Amino acid sequence: MNLSPLQAISPIDGRYRNTTESLSKYFSESALIKYRVYVEVEYFISLCEIGLPGLAKFDKANYGKLRLIHEQFSDVNAQEIKDTEKVTNHDVKAVEYFIKKQFDDLGFQDYKEFIHFGLTSQDINNTAIPYTFKLALNEVYYPNISNLISKIKELATEWKDVPLLAFTHGQPASPTKLGKEFLVFAERLEIQLNNLKNIPNSAKFGGATGNFNAHHIAYPSVNWVDFSNNFVNEVLGLTRAQHTTQIEHYDQFAAQCDALKRINNIIIDLDRDIWAYISKNYFKQRIKEGEVGSSAMPHKVNPIDFENAEGNAGIANALFEFFAAKLPISRLQRDLTDSTVLRNVGVPMAHTVIAMSSTLKGLNKIILNNDAIAADLENNWAVVAEAIQTVLRREAYPNPYEALKDLTRTNQKITADTMATFIDGLNVNETIKAELKQITPFNYTGVF
């Protein structure tokens, strides 16, 4: 069955399919099956490499043929496995039977009982899933977040000299530079991105209850811990958890979810700030011919990209938070609740990719409105009160804070003339008065 985006239940496979399609290579049902096959095949090859008696005659020259099983894996193969699952009612066993059939076709039937040798399903799932998650991070997520950070830095450079009225508690505060405000988000994202990259992609590989019972009973002379560490860490490029139950701890995966959530929180914060600046008319948005902003109000040009991003990041975070709280908890040596949860691991990643894409799209649309920014600065001369009282403190002037408070903390508008009159009335020398009169909302922006 070919599912049209029009029939998809979730918008990530429907409305937003063009944005999320790259993730289907890692998180679709077909992808999960493919990478289960990958792990099973590579495991068989690794068993051959340690010289087990039952595999001693397997020709290493045939490794390439084995790897073609997963390298050329197709949706037709995936459907064949799904058809087998209808009989077995077990997804991983269906994968095992598929590979055994491939061995029969290749003439390797004498060795097929070493497929899935000594393993439980979670040895496959708890390697295949973190492997696909690692691939998705490296090939989709990291490039997307890097593009977003690059755009933020680009705007920070472009607008590094633009003075901007700051707002704390929603009220005018000491001015800042627009470029610096973008650097705040770039710095935050880079720090959290680095934290995410330093979290190991943890995997489990140790038999039915994590003790290599079956492996050890069959070949007690083999150091199965060393074998598995090499297979998981070196062949698969993951990090093997040393002491487990039937399943992976998921503590490191929970840490990855928490890190992704923190990054999304920063994106939400950025989206809301840009939304607020647009509402203040500090930014205008590029208008595309033919687009409509409202079904009723013809004039509307809404900040829909930032609102879309905020909504999708919020959905992603709800799931990341659930994964981080739920997955590390499992009854005794294992219950099945992690299985259905892990099948949804691509969902928050998809919403995250949509959020990043929408934010980037929105940033590419915004146009600086210098006139509105300058007008707000000109209308808020009270914000230089901090500067004046600080210089007066330096000069040991009595009660400067209180004097500026009495001047500015009223309901009267403070203008350049108001400040000049106040400065003229100060009992300080003319040099200090001249210094104070040089301070304006446009140049009182600190060191950035």
Model-derived features: positions:
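Catalytic-core signal marking the mid-to-C-terminal active-site face
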Residues: 2-29, 64-65, 292-448
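Charged, flexible cofactor/metal-binding loops and thiol motifs
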Residues: 92, 126-142, 157, 163-329, ...
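Intrinsically disordered or highly flexible coil/loop and linker segments, enriched in small
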Residues: 49-56, 108-109, 142, 158-161, ...
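A helix-coil-helix interface module used to build multimeric assemblies
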Residues: 1-212, 219-230, 293, 399, ...
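A structural signal for small-residue-enriched, beta-sheet-centric alpha/beta enzyme cores
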Residues: 121, 216-220, 235, 240-244, ...
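Residue-level "edge-of-site" marker
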Residues: 60, 246, 405
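Generic, well-ordered alpha-helical scaffold segments in large soluble proteins
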Residues: 42-47, 98, 102, 136, ...
